[in-house]
Amino acid sequence: MARLFDHYKNIVIKELIQQFNYKTVMQVPKITKITLNMGVGEAAVDKKIMENAVSDLEKISAQKPIITKAKKSIATFKIRQGYPVGCMVTLRGIKMYEFLDRLVSIAIPRIRDFRGIGGKGFDGHGNFNMGIKEQIIFPEIDYDKIDKLRGLNITMTTTAKTDIEAKALLSAFKFPFKN
């Protein structure tokens, strides 16, 4: 059982029921999925770049990512319809909680000049987006074996109705928000 899942069941639910006066446990928001997306625009020129990005994302998420393809051709970017332009992986269940645990306790503290996550990543419906500029903050990535520093987008989809509920949920998971 994942450490953060036990933390959610035993502590977070009680805190949120007390804070927002929910009537049942089913009203308490929870994280449904975490989506990791890595855009690799240079993959149209060199196929090896996409293979490296896929292997990095696979090491980070412990799950095989799918390759996303361009929906339409854009001449200025030298991209044709169907060209690979990125990779993504969706985490649910125990793997999601294990990734969240590694993100909060190991990866985020390794970010250089980190002063907390800004609260502007909420979308108005209780979901949270954040970007990471370098994949080397994850301990699974060996610094000597990467070809290029790549960033990735992390989207946390929750059942929260408002951003306030979602921020309280993520703060209960010890997410380091700026005050």
UniProtKB/Swiss-Prot annotation:
A GO term from the CC aspect: ribonucleoprotein complex
MF term (GO), any: tRNA binding
Pfam families: Ribosomal_L5, Ribosomal_L5_C
Keyword rRNA-binding: yes
Domain of life: Bacteria
BP terms from Gene Ontology: translation
Key words of the record: Ribonucleoprotein, Ribosomal protein, RNA-binding, rRNA-binding, tRNA-binding
Gene3D superfamilies per UniProt: 3.30.1440.10
UniProt xrefs under SUPFAM superfamilies: RL5-like
Keyword hit for tRNA-binding: yes
Alphabetized InterPro entries for the sequence: Ribosomal_uL5, Ribosomal_uL5_bac-type, Ribosomal_uL5_C, Ribosomal_uL5_dom_sf, Ribosomal_uL5_N
Summary of the function given for this chain in its UniProt record: This is one of the proteins that bind and probably mediate the attachment of the 5S RNA into the large ribosomal subunit, where it forms part of the central protuberance. In the 70S ribosome it contacts protein S13 of the 30S subunit (bridge B1b), connecting the 2 subunits; this bridge is implicated in subunit movement. Contacts the P site tRNA; the 5S rRNA and some of its associated proteins might help stabilize positioning of ribosome-bound tRNAs.
Similarity-based family: Belongs to the universal ribosomal protein uL5 family.
Oligomer status and interactors: Part of the 50S ribosomal subunit; part of the 5S rRNA/L5/L18/L25 subcomplex. Contacts the 5S rRNA and the P site tRNA. Forms a bridge to the 30S subunit in the 70S ribosome.
PANTHER family hit by this protein: 60S RIBOSOMAL PROTEIN L11-RELATED (PTHR11994)
NCBIfam families named among the record's database cross-references: PRK00010.1 (NF000585)
Name this polypeptide is given: Large ribosomal subunit protein uL5
Origin species: Nitrosomonas eutropha (strain DSM 101675 / C91 / Nm57)
Upper classification of the organism: Bacteria, Pseudomonadati, Pseudomonadota, Betaproteobacteria, Nitrosomonadales
Gene: rplE
